[in-house]
Amino acid sequence: MIGSPSALPALVDLLGDADREIAQAAQESLASIPGTKVDAAIMAMLADGTTDRRITAMDLIVRRRMITAIPALIDTAGGTDAKLRTVAVNKLGELAGPAELPRLLDLLAKAQGSEDLEATEQALSAICLKAEKPDSSVGLVEARLAQAQPAQKCALLRVLGSIGGANALRAVRGAVSDPNAEVHATAIRVMGGWNTADAAPDLLELARTATSPTDKMICLRGYLALAGHGDLPTDQRLTMCRQAAPLALKDDEKKLLLAALGGIASV
């Protein structure tokens, strides 16, 4: 029967069938058949197959929730094939947990291009958010900032932004003063996209002291976006708008202020 372990060799062969429907049906069967023999066959595909076959193996690893395959995925993510690296990192984002965070941070440090960086950043964010307390990941991520190259540092800042919380906010706020222009700009953007009100005082101060019109606009927009949060008390939202009013000098800035005020029911 096609759904039994005895069909395993035939199903593995059919994965490479020229008919896509047949190949897909074989993959669906392999995803559902229980047992360690199927797991072993999938691991063999990952270790010694064509690029397409290895990608299929990684798909099956995630679908079968093969946690024991995480070390092999990490090895693949650090390999020489760019396509396999990206797929492996994406699958780690789906399958790995907080325990693998240090290894993913190592992969980020060695990322060889924009695709590797983006994939690893997304996987890191996904893994951190799986933690019972995502804030517990901040220390490990922040510890990599000091020695990271600018591109990696920017990715780490975005990961911290996805985690959120007071500790992550402090780390991102500190990076605003980084001498590297790219890192500074990323820190400003992450601050401007913060979605909890604990960032409001920093955003207001940054908007007041910004020497760049772009920085000011990003911080003012972020601050007024927080003022628009309906879960904040009306009085607090009004106070925030009043504090921002002296900064709204240009038409675009005034529009942001008016939009925030317009969302407050009592105004």
Predicted segments — roles?
Residues S4-G16, G35-A47, M66-G78, T86, ...:
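Amphipathic alpha-helical scaffolding segments comprising HEAT/armadillo-like alpha-solenoid repeats
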Residues A18-D19, G49-T50, T80-D81, Q112-G113, ...:
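Short inter-helical turns and helix N-cap capping residues of alpha-solenoid HEAT/ARM repeat scaffolds
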Residues S6-L8, D19-E28, K37, D52-I55, ...:
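A generic tandem-repeat structural signature
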Residues G3, L30-P34, I61, R65, ...:
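Alpha-solenoid repeat junctions
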Residues A26, A57, A88, T120, ...:
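Conserved hydrophobic register position within alpha-solenoid helical repeats
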Residues A99, E115-E118, T214-M217:
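Nucleotide-sugar-dependent
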